[in-house]
Curated annotation (Swiss-Prot):
This protein's pathway: Amino-acid biosynthesis; L-lysine biosynthesis via DAP pathway; LL-2,6-diaminopimelate from (S)-tetrahydrodipicolinate (succinylase route): step 1/3
Binding site for substrate: R106, D143
Record gene name: dapD
Originating species: Burkholderia mallei (strain ATCC 23344)
Enzyme Commission code(s) on record: 2.3.1.117
PROSITE patterns: HEXAPEP_TRANSFERASES
Intracellular or extracellular location(s): Cytoplasm
First-tier enzyme category under EC: transferase
Keyword Glycosyltransferase assigned: no
Protein's name according to its UniProt entry: 2,3,4,5-tetrahydropyridine-2,6-dicarboxylate N-succinyltransferase
Amino acid sequence: MSQQLQQIIDNAWENRAELSPKAASAEIREAVAHAIEQLDRGALRVAEKIDGAWTVHQWLKKAVLLSFRLEDNAPMPAGGYSQFYDKVPSKFANYTAEDFAAGGFRVVPPAIARRGSFIAKNVVLMPSYTNIGAYVDEGTMVDTWATVGSCAQIGKNVHLSGGVGIGGVLEPLQANPVIIEDNCFIGARSEVVEGVIVEENSVISMGVYLGQSTKIYDRETGEVTYGRIPAGSVVVAGNLPAKDGTHSLYCAVIVKKVDAKTRAKVGLNELLRGD
């Protein structure tokens, strides 16, 4: 079924300039709606780990982008105090008490998740924003004013602290989503964008900014890398001096690596304070 769905969406994408809310076949509409519904249920996801490597399903990103072309903006009520005007309704717009109970997650006012995002059991959404295509796995806390961008992949038992920004990606199609693997802690006001991967059991301190151009300096090895935080890393904000010594530029510093057992036993503050 998903192969047939993918073929319809890939073909529609090639002719997307001709599509509009008034000009699209029933087959295309149904395929796009089904893809969004599957993303919403978590039956499909934009990226998944296969044989130890992350694979991105670009056709699902195409489905999300096509959905914008196929829908008109419409007023959306906001609990009587305001209205929104958009193409994508709230994930919870038509939820009943039974739906919330079956979902097994908490949604604290005024948290927003758009339809097409997946929220797993035992997730807590504090007043935060989760965009279309995102996947938030079991036991994760999305704290106050945190943002989970479009198509971002958040693992199990992750803590996204207050004000954290997890970047979204829909265009360009070749760009990969941000991935935060299981059991990671992302400190307050940190930003992870541009398809950076934070591997499992890592701790990112408060105020760390990670993009594809951010130098990641491993204090133990002296190595500089980009775009990926290795599993079990403890990362803080830092600076690296210029070659001529006239200035320094921002970087992220891996101050140590810990295994899952140590991570479970030792408090976060102790990990971050240790030499």
